[in-house]
């Protein structure tokens, strides 16, 4: 079983610390092969180390998705759990990222955190980018930066979900966004890495998704994957498939 666990809700509907999932609830989770800890921003939780420590009793692999802003907290956690995965959400090059994220120095904080983790010898680290009209032209340039740093580069497309408390996440210029995904696919296929070839297939599938066509990779939510919200409720889906 794989799981995605949101331990801090979105900025539009922030969860209250006293209402969020507790360590006692986490202890009741089943065995899992993979766990993604996300948010909001997970590193706002001051007990994140305790959460990770408990999850490693149940999960073979853990990845935390973060904006990379809390560098000291991230580094401190990674010193105790060097096997953990860290994916820092960077939404484009510096100006684009900071406009989308609303953080004046967000890009430099995220990029600086990635560099620091790499200097520490962390292996499972990389970028995560949600592609939309505003940042699609930065898709290949950001991939090249991650490639030069020897890091993973994960992508998804802008979408809606009741969980986001948002229904206006729409890609308007679909041909332009699709073209930039196509450029990324071509870059990935030039690699000698079979893993990047599979990434190319996934990103090719995102072009289908943008145009409202059937996904190439089916959604496995509720079959071997589940989602836990900040309040400990188990959800079988978070977005359209």
Task: Please describe what each predicted stretch is.
Residues 16-21, 54, 58, 80, ...:
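Radical SAM enzyme [4Fe-4S]-AdoMet core and its adjacent flexible, acidic
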Residues 1-9, 234-241:
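Residue-level detector of conserved catalytic or cofactor/ligand-binding positions
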Residues 1, 36-38, 126, 154:
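Conserved Rossmann-like nucleotide-binding pocket used by diverse enzymes
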Residues 3-4, 8-84, 162, 177-180, ...:
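Conserved alpha-helical substructure of the radical SAM core
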Residues 1, 38-39, 67, 91, ...:
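Short glycine-rich loop/turn motifs that provide flexible caps or phosphate-binding loops at active sites
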């Amino acid at each position: 079983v794989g799981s995605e666990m949101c331990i801090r809700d979105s900025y539009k509907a922030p969860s209250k610390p006293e209402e969020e999932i507790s360590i006692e609830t986490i202890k009741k989770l089943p065995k899992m092969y993979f766990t993604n800890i996300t948010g909001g921003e997970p590193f706002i939780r001051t007990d994140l180390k305790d959460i990770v420590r408990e999850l490693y009793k149940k999960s073979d692999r853990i990845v935390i998705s973060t904006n990379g802003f809390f560098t000291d907290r991230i580094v401190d956690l990674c010193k105790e759990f060097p096997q953990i995965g860290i994916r820092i959400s960077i939404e484009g090059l510096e100006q684009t990222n900071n406009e989308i994220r609303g953080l004046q120095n967000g890009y430099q904080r995220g990029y600086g955190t990635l560099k620091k983790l790499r200097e520490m010898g962390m292996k499972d680290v990389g970028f995560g980018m949600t592609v939309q009209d505003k940042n699609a032209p930065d898709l290949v340039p950001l991939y090249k930066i991650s490639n030069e740093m020897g890091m993973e580069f994960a992508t998804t497309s802008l979408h809606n979900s009741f969980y986001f408390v948002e229904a206006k996440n729409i890609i308007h210029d679909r041909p332009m966004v699709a073209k930039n995904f196509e450029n990324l696919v071509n870059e990935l296929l030039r690699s000698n890495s079979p893993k990047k070839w599979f990434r190319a297939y996934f990103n090719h599938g995102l072009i289908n998704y943008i145009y409202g066509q059937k996904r190439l990779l089916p959604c496995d939510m509720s079959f071997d994957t589940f989602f836990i919200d900040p309040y400990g409720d188990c959800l079988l889906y978070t977005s359209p498939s």
